[in-house]
């Protein structure tokens, strides 16, 4: 079933010379080892936040290994981490700006030709200024990333929300963590987990909800496995819509019908109440109850019949207060019998799961990832798991924790904490709150009224607005939405190729997105720049620049800041705004945002000796330090405290809030969290009354389900060897050879009934599109009958041509786990 590495799609004369095979090699001999220089850095891949030691020689990364001093991974890596040294050296690395041209000038139908950075910024400025003049700030936008460094995301946020006055900036974390964000915000009034990875060694029970930790968070899974095999009382429950590698450790394996996790969660709450397992003292002191809006729609276009039918599509994130008695009545219909019947999970397993949570002598950690979050009711699923932990009081203490795991290295640190979502500002502030806008404007030293009140376009909406011609200039960095976005052919590609639009992609390789763009900017990656990530346990980690980027590639930070020099306030701010700050009139956005007396206050001499820093060389001051310290001002004294900049280069990361030099492992609990008042025990201080909310939320069906024409469920996701769209891992020969192609995992009986067999080539067809791939009936993923699983890493099998662009109406996060498809035979094999 292995196939040769496919030829990259045609990429223009300027990119000529791209070989068919992309190789990366860094063989190290014993004699070479003595000349290696080692430094620490967080891994470039997932949100676990492993630390690695990076070896450089002659200006190149030549080796990596797990950092034995790191608390997260304790010296080990997953298979992707072991090949980190090769991700930067694929032979099709982008090294020059490339513009679509014909007859020496830009042409949207032209071929890519190399240009200078000066020319690139010239046409970008021309397009941005024309759109802003013609249609205002709503016509420009940016799609960023949970892979941005902290200061890259912060600089982008400032440039768009303050400089260009457009809230149309959103990260690809919208696709992966937005439901977790809104779940935290609704239940606790603050974002991010209250626990930490130390819970793993302290708990008696692990419950995985829609999380294949064995492949997606393998280093954490090794810690879970060690705990399970070392302590006989420890139990592991795994819930998913299909069987995967995490089931190998499960004491309670449960495959449920798609969307019925909502029923199971409400059943557990009902069981806790009816069995007398409610922690009455905890609930009375620390919890209040609310009934959330129901029938809230599916985040589709407003003219979609499902949206027209929904009663509360415009009131999705609203609720009314109720009491405990009303909540108990609400969950009462979610009986064991009903739950077993509708979920397909045997009753005895459901009851055993409920008992894990109900037993007052047993500690429980709940882990979840995309199975919960990529869900049309993902926010509800998050709220419902918090309900269970709050009813039992199993929260905010060692071994008792509801824990949302992140998929990107800085989805927490950059997307969430920095606030690069279209509705957010740093440290949980939001653009719709006038006091929050005032705080940001004061810290940023811009006039009152600079930041717009209206929420910008979220990720899926950006694609729709590009298609509709509302959004006309679009810049993406560290993302590959043409492969990762939903419903690509109907809702993503049309907007990118709309002749009225201009699309810029900053990336390191010619991804599917890059090849659909008008202008490609070559970016520096990982240790080619100084950076900071924030992982899933609130741990902020720094690294130094260790090598130079190839050719003319530049960091995303340099691109953003240098581009800001192309605008003056007169060109982008209205006269009434400038009248409030006449001293800013005529200044560039670079002067206003980045030479503002705060960002530029740290001299180049503050840089640690012996390290390069291309941005310090370019701008003449320690811009990373200045951006970080300005950003940190948002959270200090408000429960989001970060340590001083220099502390992070010394440590293997620190978990916020960091107060008086001490990190916080468990939030909201007295004795661990410095923000909790003495004698209170627990304070959920995100809300003024310092109480968390338990939500009454029902089961509601998915946006699309199998029928006679499309009889299978489709779920998408990842595999161990590849990360997201494979733009890095597919260029590592060892990882590519291990898993060269995306496969259609299906039940053997389904294959037999369709007259297929393992290796058969099929079409996966939905109402939106189709792909070709081969069938796999054995191996790591074992779907139940009626469901197929296809990973999305393969650029030659774009499964997101098939997926539905339904989202959670509260979080606006896409549901990649549930749509209807049919399977058609092409070649039997």
Curated annotation (Swiss-Prot):
How the protein assembles, per its UniProt entry? Answer: Component of the periplasmic nitrate reductase NapAB complex composed of NapA and NapB.
Region forming the signal peptide: 1-30
Q: Where does substrate bind?
A: 792
What family does this chain come from, according to its entry? Answer: Belongs to the prokaryotic molybdopterin-containing oxidoreductase family. NasA/NapA/NarB subfamily.
For this protein, what is the EC number? 1.9.6.1
Q: Which cofactor does it need?
A: [4Fe-4S] cluster; Mo-bis(molybdopterin guanine dinucleotide)
- Please give the chief subcellular localization of this protein: periplasm
Instruction: Show the catalytic activity.
Output: 2 Fe(II)-[cytochrome] + nitrate + 2 H(+) = 2 Fe(III)-[cytochrome] + nitrite + H2O
One GO cellular component this record assigns the protein to is:
periplasmic space
UniProt keyword Iron-sulfur present = yes
Q: Please spell out the taxonomic lineage of the organism that makes this protein.
A: Bacteria, Pseudomonadati, Pseudomonadota, Gammaproteobacteria, Pseudomonadales
Q: Which PANTHER family match?
A: PERIPLASMIC NITRATE REDUCTASE (PTHR43105:SF11), RESPIRATORY NITRATE REDUCTASE (PTHR43105)
**Matching CDD domains, A to Z?**
MopB_CT_Nitrate-R-NapA-like, MopB_Nitrate-R-NapA-like
Q: Which InterPro entries match?
A: Asp_de-COase-like_dom_sf (IPR009010), CT_Nitrate-R-NapA-like (IPR041957), MoPterin_dinucl-bd_dom (IPR006657), Mopterin_OxRdtase (IPR006656), Mopterin_OxRdtase_4Fe-4S_dom (IPR006963), MopterinOxRdtase_cofactor_BS (IPR027467), Periplasm_NO3_reductase_lsu (IPR010051), Prok_molybdopt-oxidoreductase (IPR050123)
Show the GO MF annotations: 4 iron, 4 sulfur cluster binding; electron transfer activity; iron ion binding; molybdenum ion binding; molybdopterin cofactor binding; nitrate reductase (cytochrome) activity; nitrate reductase activity
Residues recorded as binding [4Fe-4S] cluster, renumbered to this chain, are 43, 46, 50, 78
Question: Sorted alphabetically, which Pfam families does this protein's record hold?
Answer: Molybdop_Fe4S4, Molybdopterin, Molydop_binding
Annotated Mo-bis(molybdopterin guanine dinucleotide) binding sites? 80, 147, 172, 176, 209-216, 240-244, 259-261, 370, 374, 480, 506-507, 529, 556, 716-725, 800, 817
Q: Does the keyword Signal apply?
A: yes
Q: What is this protein called?
A: Periplasmic nitrate reductase
Question: Cofactor comment in the record?
Answer: Binds 1 [4Fe-4S] cluster. Binds 1 molybdenum-bis(molybdopterin guanine dinucleotide) (Mo-bis-MGD) cofactor per subunit.
UniProt domain 4Fe-4S Mo/W bis-MGD-type: residue ranges: 36-92
Q: What does this protein do?
A: Catalytic subunit of the periplasmic nitrate reductase complex NapAB. Receives electrons from NapB and catalyzes the reduction of nitrate to nitrite.
Keywords linked to the UniProt accession: 4Fe-4S, Electron transport, Iron, Iron-sulfur, Metal-binding, Molybdenum, Nitrate assimilation, Oxidoreductase, Periplasm, Signal, Transport
């Amino acid at each position: 079933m292995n196939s040769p590495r496919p030829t990259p799609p045609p990429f223009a004369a300027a990119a000529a010379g791209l070989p068919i095979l992309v190789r990366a090699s860094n063989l190290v001999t014993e004699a070479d080892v003595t000349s290696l220089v080692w430094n620490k850095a967080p891994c470039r891949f997932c949100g676990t936040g492993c630390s690695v030691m990076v070896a450089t020689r002659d200006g190149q990364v030549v080796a990596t290994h797990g950092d034995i001093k790191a608390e997260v991974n304790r010296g080990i890596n997953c298979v992707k981490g072991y090949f980190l040294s090769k991700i930067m050296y694929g032979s099709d690395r982008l090294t020059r700006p490339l513009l679509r041209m014909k007859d020496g000038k830009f042409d949207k139908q032209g071929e890519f030709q190399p240009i200078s950075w000066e020319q690139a910024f010239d046409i970008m400025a021309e397009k941005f200024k024309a759109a802003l003049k013609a249609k205002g700030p709503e016509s420009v936008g940016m799609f960023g990333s949970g892979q941005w460094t902290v200061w890259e995301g912060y600089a982008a946020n400032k440039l768009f929300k303050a400089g260009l006055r457009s809230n149309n900036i959103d990260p690809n974390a919208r696709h992966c963590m937005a439901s977790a964000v809104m779940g935290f915000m609704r239940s606790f009034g603050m974002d991010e987990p209250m626990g930490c990875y130390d819970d793993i060694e302290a708990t008696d029970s692990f419950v995985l909800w829609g999380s294949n930790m064995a492949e997606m968070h393998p280093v954490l899974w090794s810690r879970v496995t060690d705990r399970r095999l070392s302590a006989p009382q420890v139990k592991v429950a795994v819930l998913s819509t299909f069987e995967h590698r995490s089931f190998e450790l499960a004491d309670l394996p449960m495959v449920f019908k798609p969307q019925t996790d909502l029923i199971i969660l409400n059943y557990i709450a009902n069981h806790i109440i009816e069995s007398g397992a409610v922690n009455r003292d905890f609930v009375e002191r620390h919890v209040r109850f609310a009934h959330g809006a129901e029938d809230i729609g599916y985040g589709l276009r407003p003219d979609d019949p499902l949206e027209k039918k929904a009663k509360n599509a415009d009131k999705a994130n609203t609720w009314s207060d109720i009491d405990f008695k009303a909540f108990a009545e609400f969950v009462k219909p979610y009986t064991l019998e009903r739950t077993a019947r509708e979920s397909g999970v045997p009753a005895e397993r459901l009851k055993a799961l409920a008992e894990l949570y109900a037993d007052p002598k047993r500690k429980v950690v709940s882990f979840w990832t995309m199975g919960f979050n990529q869900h049309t009711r993902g926010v509800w699923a998050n709220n419902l798991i918090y309900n269970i932990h709050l009813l039992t009081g199993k929260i905010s203490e060692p071994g008792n924790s509801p824990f949302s795991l992140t998929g990107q290295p800085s989805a927490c640190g950059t997307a969430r904490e920095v606030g690069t979502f279209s509705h957010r500002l740093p440290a949980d502030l939001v653009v719709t709150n006038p006091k929050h806008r005032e705080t940001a404007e004061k810290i940023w030293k811009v006039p009152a009224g600079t930041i717009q009140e209206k929420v910008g376009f979220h990720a899926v909406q950006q694609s729709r607005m590009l298609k509709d011609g509302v959004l006309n200039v679009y810049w993406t960095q560290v993302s590959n939405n043409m492969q990762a976005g939903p419903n690509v052919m109907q809702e993503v590609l049309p907007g990118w190729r709309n002749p009225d639009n201009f699309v810029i992609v900053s990336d390191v390789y010619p991804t599917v997105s890059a090849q659909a763009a008008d202008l490609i900017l070559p970016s520096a990656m990982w240790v080619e720049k100084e950076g900071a990530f924030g992982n899933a346990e609130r741990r902020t980690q720094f690294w130094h620049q260790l090598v130079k980027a190839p050719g003319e590639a530049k960091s995303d930070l340099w691109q953003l800041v240098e581009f800001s020099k192309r605008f003056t306030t007169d060109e982008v701010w209205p006269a009434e705004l400038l009248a409030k700050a006449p001293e800013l009139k005529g200044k560039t956005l670079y002067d206003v945002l980045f030479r503002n007396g705060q960002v530029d206050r740290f001299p180049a001499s503050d840089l640690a000796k012996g390290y390069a820093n291309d941005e310090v060389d370019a701008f003449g001051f320690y811009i990373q330090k200045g951006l970080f310290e300005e950003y940190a001002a948002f959270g200090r004294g408000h429960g989001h405290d970060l340590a001083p900049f220099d502390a992070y280069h010394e440590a293997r990361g620190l978990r916020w809030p960091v107060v008086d030099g001490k990190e916080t492992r468990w939030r909201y609990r007295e004795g661990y969290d410095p923000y909790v008042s003495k004698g209170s025990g627990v304070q959920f201080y995100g809300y003024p009354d310092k109480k968390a909310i338990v939500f009454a939320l029902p089961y509601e069906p998915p946006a699309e389900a199998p029928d006679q024409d499309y009889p299978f469920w489709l779920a998408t996701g990842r595999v161990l060897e590849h990360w997201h769209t494979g733009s890095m891992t597919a260029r590592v020969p060892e990882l590519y050879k291990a898993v060269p192609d995306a496969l259609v995992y299906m039940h053997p009986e389904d294959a037999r009934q369709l007259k297929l067999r393992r290796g058969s080539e099929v079409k996966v067809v939905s109402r939106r599109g189709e792909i070709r791939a081969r069938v796999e009936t054995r191996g790591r993923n074992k779907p139940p009958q009626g469901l197929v699983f296809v990973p999305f890493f393969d650029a030659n099998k774009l499964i997101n041509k098939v997926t539905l662009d339904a989202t959670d109406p509260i979080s606006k996060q896409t549901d990649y786990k549930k749509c209807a498809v049919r399977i058609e035979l092409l070649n039997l094999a």
